[in-house]
Amino acid sequence: MDAYRAVVDKRDQRVYLPKPIPDEALRRILQAARMTGSSKNREPNRLIVVTEREGVRALAALSEWGRWLAHAAAVIVIAQVEPHEFDAGRCAQNMMIAAWADGIGSCPAHLPEAEVARLLGIPRDVHVNRVIGFGSVDPVRAAAPKSVARRRKPIEELVHRERW
């Protein structure tokens, strides 16, 4: 899948097949994170990869809105000593696009930072910035017609040239 197709076709996925992510696919996801550009080339992102079922389920139990994570094959937490929202967002998007290109679905989740940190043994001076679930998607479900939620505003409504 080329980069453009991966970007425009990607959809958040919260339903996964009950199988692990192949090691090579997970390695590519992590490599995409590692190669993410960062402000002043600081490389602030640190990744905690959770694949053991007990840990994945414990993360899912931290928030009503994160319950779907219980079925993820992996949860990756982006942590930073100094919070850099922009850099964390770039890293998250790189991982999710790389995953989608390999047929792996993903979706960010909002979990309480302090509880994630406690559960994963993250030091007090390190900030939990993003939590993302990953898993193999049903190819039929992934190829289904785009839902109403996936429709986007026309480009003419979003883009202004030269001035507002």
Language-model segments: residues:
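Acidic, surface-exposed loops and disordered segments
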Residues: 1-164
